[in-house]
Structures are given as structure tokens and as C-alpha cells.
Amino acid sequence: MTRINTNTQKNNNTKFSKLILGVMVSSIVLSGCSATPERMEKFSYEPNYPMNIPKKTVPKNGSLYQSGDAITLFDDSRAHKVGDIITINLAENFDAKKKDEAKYDKSNQQNFGLNGQAAVGSNASVFGGNVSVPGLGSGIGIGYGSDGSFAGKSDVKQKSSLSGSIAVTVVQVISNGNLVIRGEKWITIHEGEEVIRFAGIVRPQDIRPDNTIDSEKVADVRLIYKDTGISGDTNRPGAMTQWLHKYWPL
């Protein structure tokens, strides 16, 4: 009867081990099949079109030259109202270095003792009574100590640059005259897509006569560049590597 129970317990342990192994393998496989979430954040406002901007109407006076269609010699053609287009010259360079080093050492040692007047094999006085304590010498000593240390070091370097141009649209005119702009550019190459999104606030004085402005003069810039093609996948670690970095305890 004992042998039967032992064999049954071994079979149960084997089944449980196989079940745990199967769950671990399934988790790894499913994590590899899961797609990497795309970080394409939406803007706080809707796309620029259609803007439903009312067309300015000028009464017809019957003349060959209408005042509403006239362009004066000193007219400023720079963007200044909702719907106007501005070209942003991208010249973004980012170079960051960070180095941290920490070291921690702590040591603690404590000793205390109890002195006795009894010799080996004699009686000692404990709470007013005589107690025979074999092996008690001149005293009892107790000591303990603890040591702790920690050392950490990190060195992070990041460098990136982005150059080019993107056309954006004025979506809002603030009360102080500054312009809120936004725009995006989608480029599909083979099986991948490159997406550039740009948003910010510009001063009309910084806009050149040809309706261009450098990105360094734009305030509150929100610049997103995303590559969903093969080249973008090569810059990201695989699913197994991501899983190990997230759940591996060491």
C-alpha cells in the first residue's frame, strides 16, 4: 500500500512539473507573438481639414478691378491667419551624457560578556541559588557583527539628429498674435511607413517672407518621428530580449 501511494505522489509531481513547464513555454511564445505597441500619440486638436473657414465676401461694384481681389505693393504675404501654411526647417540636434557612481560601505560590531566566579565543574550563584554549571570558566562572551556594501555605476550616452523640412498649417491664432501650428507627413516605402508630426507655437515676426521658419524658433515643440518599416524593427530588441529585461530578476 505504501508503494502505491509513493508512485501516485511521484506521478502527480511529474504532471505538475510538466504543467509548470508548459505554462512557461506558452508565456514565452505568446510574448513573442505580441506586437510592440506603437507610440503614436494624438494631437490635442483634430486634423486641419476641412476647416470650414468662411470666405470673405466683398460686394461687387461692377468695375473691372475688384477691391477684394487687389494685392497692394506693401501687402505682407506671410502666414498670419488660420489655414495659412508655414514650412518648418528641421535642424534638431540632441546630445546628452549622464554618468552616475555610488558607493556604500557599512560595518557594525558588538561584543558583550557575563563574568562568572565559578571554576569549571563548580557551583555558580544564579538568582540567589547555587546551580552547578559544568564548563563555566571565567565568563561568557557573546559577540556579533554585520557588514554591508553597495556599489553602482551607470554611464548613459544618447545622440540624435533630425534634419529636413515639413509643411504645417496654422490652426489657431492666440490673443497675443502668436500662431499655433501643426502638421504631419506620412511616407510609405515598400512595406514600412515613416511618420513625422510637428506642433508648436510661433511668432509672426520670426516667419520669413517666404513663409519658412527654423524649428529652433518654435516654442512648445511636439516633434514625433516614427519608423514602422524594416529599419525601425532592427533598432528595437526582439520580444524574447524585452521579456528577459522585464522579468529576469538579475
Swiss-Prot record:
Sites of N-palmitoyl cysteine lipidation: C33
Keyword Manganese: no
InterPro entries: Flag_Lring (IPR000527)
Lipidation (S-diacylglycerol cysteine): C33
Segment forming the signal sequence: 1-32
Keywords annotated in UniProt: Bacterial flagellum, Cell outer membrane, Lipoprotein, Membrane, Palmitate, Signal
Gene Ontology biological process terms, A to Z: bacterial-type flagellum-dependent cell motility
Bilayer disposition of the protein: Lipid-anchor
Pfam family, any one: FlgH
Primary subcellular site in the record, as a coarse category: membrane
Protein's cellular compartments: Cell outer membrane; Bacterial flagellum basal body
Lipoprotein found in the keyword field: yes
GO cellular component terms, semicolon-separated: bacterial-type flagellum basal body, distal rod, L ring; cell outer membrane
Molecular function as annotated in GO: cytoskeletal motor activity
Family as reported in the entry's similarity comment: Belongs to the FlgH family.
Known function: Assembles around the rod to form the L-ring and probably protects the motor/basal body from shearing forces during rotation.
Assembly information from the UniProt record: The basal body constitutes a major portion of the flagellar organelle and consists of four rings (L,P,S, and M) mounted on a central rod.
Name recorded for this polypeptide: Flagellar L-ring protein
Native source organism of the sequence: Hydrogenovibrio crunogenus (strain DSM 25203 / XCL-2) (Thiomicrospira crunogena)
Originating gene: flgH
